[in-house]
Amino acid sequence: MASIRSCTPAILLGLLATLGDAAGLLVSHYNGNLYSLSFIQDGNTGQLAVKQTLKAGGGMPSWLTLDSDTGSLWVTDESTYGSPVLTQLQVGSDGTMKVTGTSKSNGGEVHSSLYGGSNGKGFIAAAEYDPSSISSWKLPITGNTQAVQKLTYTMSGRGPVASRQDKPHPHSTFTDPTGKYLLAPDLGADLIRIFAIEASSGKLTACTAAKTGGGDGPRHGAFWIPRAGSIDGTMLYIVNELGNSVSAWTVSYPSGGCLTLAKTQTVSTYPTGKSAPNGSKAAEVHVAGNFVYAVNRNDKSFGSTSDSVATYSITLETGAITFVEATNAYTYYPRTFQINKAGDLVAFGGQTSSTVAIVQRNTTTGRLGPQIANLLVGTRGGAGNEDGLSAVIWNE
């Protein structure tokens, strides 16, 4: 095979045509487009290319949720004007996307996850940031699909960060390891909302929410289980956008009651002795093996257009996290990132740079390495604006 670095785009696409199982990624952009990317790796180098551009996902496609078993893809719409939609697509074996259904949504959706049904994939729940609500739909999505439920929240006054905590702002939804509970960090209310799932109907019943630190602004979360096949010792790690930190929570399952959380520690997304730069915001969090990763937006730690990602190690016995290092995310304003199934590559999506960067990861040490590929996708965004790349996921 020719060296990737010597390939022209035409040659690269030819190579990809012969590599049916080459890795791929899916990207959403606030310009109203979805993109299917190809990625091929040659040792310590790689190359990304756009295979398909599709106008879909509403006015502001904001998040991608993929069922890799069936190739079904759902896209939420953050726009609150016009006619916001929830879109379902089918992703072919070659990465080509095709819309299979759309349904009217409330708008303001910034994140979604599958839950319920017989296999944990019968419904989809979306966090609606500006509407202060969480809505859910039965799958599959068609033109006649109606929301199963819409839960709307209020609060009596502003939070400690008054400019951002003017009202409840649910920012994500995700299920616990048992699939029996749905959680939704609320940035505006400083809460982690917890719901019991009725699998057959998709109904969500509120449990007692967990209270975060004042002004933390919880955004996303990721679970960790110390031993496969057991929920004993389960931990939840929440990234706090306003606090620029990650909090560790123990997870308990009382007999006859709801899932409960207890916070054990909060650790900065920056090294000891370094304060979060003015205007920086922590974004997404993921767990891989015994490591936690959280991205920082607008910290410019590695240059005017290069932000950082924090790595933490997890203590097996306690679930406590220790800051390891901050490394280059090779993107500006990384709103989104995902680790591949093999655990050896990380895809970062820069909202403002509108670039996808592929970075190597050591599966033993957990440390992130050099960038091996980078691609501009769509048009660049403006600093502080929601007009660039919104999400990137591996298609695997």
PLM region descriptions:
Residues 1-24:
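Fungal secretory targeting signals
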Residues 279-354:
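Loop/turn-rich, solvent-exposed surfaces of beta-rich toroidal or solenoidal domains
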Residues 37-45, 88-96, 137-148, 195-203, ...:
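Short loop/turn segments immediately following beta-strands, especially the blade-tip
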Residues 47-122:
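Blade-loop segments of beta-propeller domains
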Residues 49-56, 98-104, 149, 157-163, ...:
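A short beta-strand motif characteristic of beta-propeller blades
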